[in-house]
Amino acid sequence: MNDSLTIAGKSYRSRLLVGTGKYKDFAETRAAIDASGAEIVTVAIRRTNIGQNADEPNLLDVLPPERFTILPNTAGCYTADDAVRTLRLARELLDGHALVKLEVLGDPVSLFPNMPETLKAAETLVKDGFQVMVYCADDPIQAKMLEDIGCVAVMPLASLIGSGMGILNPWNLRLIIDQANVPVLVDAGVGTASDAAIAMELGCDGVLMNTAIAHAKDPVLMASAMKKAVEAGREAFLAGRMPRKHYSADPSSPTSGLIGS
């Protein structure tokens, strides 16, 4: 079955996107990403060397752009201006690469998105030729506004970044999914494989995660688990779950037509 994820006109086999931070070293980063099967990897430009500093190890030596789609992000930015400046730098470092992940944070404690600044930055970046995937609140109205601006994917949080609390508001996610004409990917809050599966069962087009893998006791094994969870959740969504019944039990084994009855 051909069931690829298409973002900005490019198709991907994997619906799991992963971050590159918080690992003990680049070797563990590469091993975990290989185990995840991810094709899109996101990189915090303000925290990770992808060529800005010639004297430091370069992540692109471990994750070559020829094999992976590098998704620069604006983690650590708290204003639209900072986010735009950061992604313009990333475009220079990556030879005109246009696909980016925008996140503008509200405060350093919750890391909740600052939506007015996010909307402002998104509008500027889209006009500047970027293909913007955007981290946002689980607000259906603002998610639709980001789509209308021209973002190529909306990425509502499941819960706070790094919290591992899972999906706290599935109803809002479903509203966002039902109205969207661009891919919807859960971003932030996934803690374990069942969270990823639930996101996919709700109808999300993909899941992005970092801490859930990097802070697991065995990151490589957790990456493998997340790969399977995303695949299983997607298949369950496509298969269509049975209706929930709060009454009138329907036994798996029929009681009529039994031998000897």
Curated annotation (Swiss-Prot):
Gene expressing this chain: thiG
Protein known as: Thiazole synthase
Principal place of residence: cytoplasm
Function: Catalyzes the rearrangement of 1-deoxy-D-xylulose 5-phosphate (DXP) to produce the thiazole phosphate moiety of thiamine. Sulfur is provided by the thiocarboxylate moiety of the carrier protein ThiS. In vitro, sulfur can be provided by H(2)S.
Lineage: Bacteria, Pseudomonadati, Pseudomonadota, Betaproteobacteria, Rhodocyclales
Residues that coordinate or bind 1-deoxy-D-xylulose 5-phosphate: 162, 188-189, 210-211
Biological processes, Gene Ontology terms: thiamine diphosphate biosynthetic process
Functional pathway: Cofactor biosynthesis; thiamine diphosphate biosynthesis
Family, per entry: Belongs to the ThiG family.
